[in-house]
Amino acid sequence: MKASRFFIGTLKEAPADAEIVSHKLMVRAGMIRRVAGGIYNYLPVGLRSIRKVEAIVREEMNRAGAIELLMPAVQPAELWQESGRWEQYGPELLRFKDRKQNEFVIGPTHEEVVTDIARNQIKSYRQMPVNFYQIQTKFRDEIRPRFGVMRGREFIMKDAYSFDKDHESLKESYKKMYDAYVRIFTRIGLEFRPVAADNGSIGGSGSHEFHVIADTGEDAIAYCPTSDFAANVEAAEALPLLASRAAPAEAMQKVATPGKAKCEAVAELMGIPLERTIKSIVLATDNEGAEPTIWLLMLRGDHDLNEIKTAKLPGLAGHRFATEAEIVEWFGTPPGYLGPIGTKKPVRVVADRTVANMSDFVVGANEVDYHIAGVNWGRDLPEPVVADIRNVKAGDPSPDGKGALDICRGIEVGHVFQLGTKYSDAMGATFIDESGKAQPMVMGCYGIGITRILGAAIEQNFDDKGIVWPEAIAPFEVVLCPMGYDRSDAVREAADKLYADLAAAGIDVILDDRGERPGVMFADWELIGVPHRLVIGERGLKDGKIEYQGRRDAEATLLPADSAAAAVAEKVRAALAR
């Protein structure tokens, strides 16, 4: 490729609405341009990197035995109504009607469509296992698209769907996809972690997310530095921080705490550690034609409620936070002074594992400006229902028993799910098993955010000059910067020969023949992030030398002109092989 025949749309300044590094650099490097909120044009530089990501994904999916197909972006409402997600999905699902008033959606995902394919095409256990995948444009009507390609409304995704005869076979399909994802992200050159995760709205029983580690990540990841354990904070098990409950050492007493509605303020006033206070959270579950059930959840004062874990407890599916009016009706006081002792109406108490092992703790007195100290289970309160209802914190013991947890930020770029029979049952996707009986197909689904990978890679790989691409997904591997290409025959001939030699060696090379000043050329290619640069000048050629500099190198080095192409080609191959 020659730069004079390519489009280079670099900018000196980032748009005012760009908040994070990847968004700023993708715009400045001429990779993307905004069309509407969360919708982008991918310019030639950006598209080249997208195609390289897609190529790696295709190679590894094919290697894992998946079969590529292509499903429509537009899907009929009937399929979503069959699965039940027409009502469940919410406003993120972009719905519209055609001229005949038929309802459709622009697909954010394709479980319904692929299940429709399977129920019509797969009849026997002999046709399974099978795994279909596609690389397709998706649309989710995000309420607040931001961060460029990180949280866009339109995006490119690889989604795959496996169909198996039973759950044991699904585990094998799942493992193949898990391993394929590890290979994909390793080949791309990302620092990543697979983490145990919650299935969310997709459904099913088991899942892992793949996170690129970056300070700008939206997700909190709990991991153990001394083991392989990693999980999304929303899914990580929080072990009790006390091995057993100590015997009571204090008498229960009511304490005046004027104006102290927060655990931190109460602890400071009483001169006790925050860890001895209890945070009370009131939830409600509605009962048709009757009063709601009111729940009091008890957490240590320095801990936070995990709503995902809470929703999985018996009776708490579909819970909501109680209104202030309900709180006053059941407890006789507004939030800030709530506790399990002396409620006006019966409430169901759930204590976090750590709280269940506490002694001599402090709770609200259900009276404004008062708390109760020296509270103990068994003596002052009946034994509670005990459950893991909190988020883990840095320093907590790792669930695998191999050290303490740390917390980092991650950008989710992939997710694998064991769906089970959720969609098969809802949509009647059955097959005939070995005994001649109809059984529901057992499904898995596996997604990778193709365009999001670009943003995540940049968040890990940049400096004050621009992007520093991992070799495998750089728009070009090598750039040739001739000094005076349009003025010097020697420079032009040397540059053209280098270009031909590198291209013949299979290197993705671009020759900057625009005739720009050296400073402009260097700034453009450092911003775009090409990993290797060769500078050809008359002075160097007289000495038989060409200047080489890697994008990550602090200084340039000189290479013999007659072997520069071979030397750089070897550097590229070595980088891709890592």
UniProtKB/Swiss-Prot annotation:
EC number(s) for this protein?
A: 6.1.1.15
Instruction: Report the catalytic activity.
Output: tRNA(Pro) + L-proline + ATP = L-prolyl-tRNA(Pro) + AMP + diphosphate
GO molecular function per UniProt: aminoacyl-tRNA deacylase activity; ATP binding; proline-tRNA ligase activity
Q: Which UniProt keywords apply?
A: Aminoacyl-tRNA synthetase, ATP-binding, Cytoplasm, Ligase, Nucleotide-binding, Protein biosynthesis
User: GO cellular component terms?
Assistant: cytosol
Compartments where found: Cytoplasm
Q: Which InterPro entries match?
A: aa-tRNA-synt_IIb, aa-tRNA-synth_II, aa-tRNA-synth_II/BPL/LPL, Anticodon-bd, Anticodon-bd_dom_sf, Pro-tRNA-ligase_IIa, Pro-tRNA-synth_IIa_bac-type, Pro-tRNA-Synthase_IIa_type1
Q: What is its main location?
A: cytoplasm
For biological process, the GO terms are:
prolyl-tRNA aminoacylation
SUPFAM superfamilies tied to this protein: Class II aaRS ABD-related, Class II aaRS and biotin synthetases, YbaK/ProRS associated domain
Highest taxon above the source species: Bacteria
Q: Kindly give the PROSITE patterns that the UniProt entry links to this protein.
A: AA_TRNA_LIGASE_II (PS50862)
Its domain comment says: Consists of three domains: the N-terminal catalytic domain, the editing domain and the C-terminal anticodon-binding domain.
Q: What does this protein do?
A: Catalyzes the attachment of proline to tRNA(Pro) in a two-step reaction: proline is first activated by ATP to form Pro-AMP and then transferred to the acceptor end of tRNA(Pro). As ProRS can inadvertently accommodate and process non-cognate amino acids such as alanine and cysteine, to avoid such errors it has two additional distinct editing activities against alanine. One activity is designated as 'pretransfer' editing and involves the tRNA(Pro)-independent hydrolysis of activated Ala-AMP.
Q: Which family does it belong to?
A: Belongs to the class-II aminoacyl-tRNA synthetase family. ProS type 1 subfamily.
Q: How does it assemble?
A: Homodimer.
Entry protein name: Proline--tRNA ligase
Organism source for this protein?
Answer: Burkholderia pseudomallei (strain K96243)
Phylogenetic lineage: Bacteria, Pseudomonadati, Pseudomonadota, Betaproteobacteria, Burkholderiales
Gene from which the chain derives = proS
